[in-house]
């Protein structure tokens, strides 16, 4: 995969989209079905030649691009701190995951099991697929620690379907974090290349 600014921004946008959808489900008990489908689909896409291909096209990540642009434009109090906390947490967990090959294998096997469910039901967002992906997250990423504490309405958080959707979205966020790292992303790049990342984000939003 090319370590290009475009690939890095698309991966970051996917990460922000996953975090934004987690917020939607946690606070409102629902999220945009097309945006959710895009994130779930990325977990089964391994043949694409670039990051955009993994998500179908960049337009499917518009929500994430908008959230990313907002975070890059604002500093301090202007930022969505809840969203930032999810993104930082996912980036941290991805780094821990990459140091544990047996855990990576567990994630891979879990996704393969969910993929069989997807093929059987011919629907990547079927509740059985969602349950399998959520269980994969719970059995692997959740064990790495520290767990990501999701804020929201208790009535929505205690609903088993919503809890599964949130875990699936967090797993898709880990996938995006892996892509960010593969495209040359790092903490230092986030800190010192904000202007370049923002320019590319705005360019993608303008298309």
Swiss-Prot record:
SUPFAM superfamilies: YcfC-like. Pfam families: DUF489 (PF04356). InterPro entries: HflD, HflD-like_sf. GO terms for cellular component: cytoplasm; plasma membrane. It is a peripheral membrane protein. It is found in: Cytoplasm; Cell inner membrane. Keywords: Cell inner membrane, Cell membrane, Cytoplasm, Membrane. Belongs to the HflD family. This is High frequency lysogenization protein HflD homolog. The gene is hflD.
């Amino acid at each position: 995969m090319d370590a290009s600014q475009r690939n890095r921004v698309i991966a970051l946008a996917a990460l922000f989209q996953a975090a934004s959808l987690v917020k939607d489900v946690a606070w409102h008990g629902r999220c945009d079905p097309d945006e959710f489908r895009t994130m779930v689909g990325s977990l089964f896409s391994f043949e694409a030649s670039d990051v955009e291909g993994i998500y179908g096209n960049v337009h499917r990540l518009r929500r994430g691009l908008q959230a990313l642009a907002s975070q890059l434009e604002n500093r301090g109090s202007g930022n969505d701190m809840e969203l930032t906390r999810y993104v930082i947490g996912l980036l941290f967990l991805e780094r821990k995951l990459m140091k544990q090959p047996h855990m990576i294998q567990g994630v891979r096997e879990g996704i393969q099991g969910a993929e069989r469910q997807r093929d059987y039901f011919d629907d990547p967002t079927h509740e059985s697929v969602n349950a399998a992906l959520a269980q994969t997250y719970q059995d692997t990423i959740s064990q790495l620690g520290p767990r990501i504490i999701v804020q929201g309405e208790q009535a929505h958080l205690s609903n088993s379907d919503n809890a599964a959707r949130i875990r699936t979205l967090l797993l898709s966020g880990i996938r995006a974090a892996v892509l960010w790292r593969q495209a040359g992303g790092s903490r230092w790049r986030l800190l010192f290349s904000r202007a370049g990342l923002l320019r590319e984000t705005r360019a993608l939003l303008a298309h």
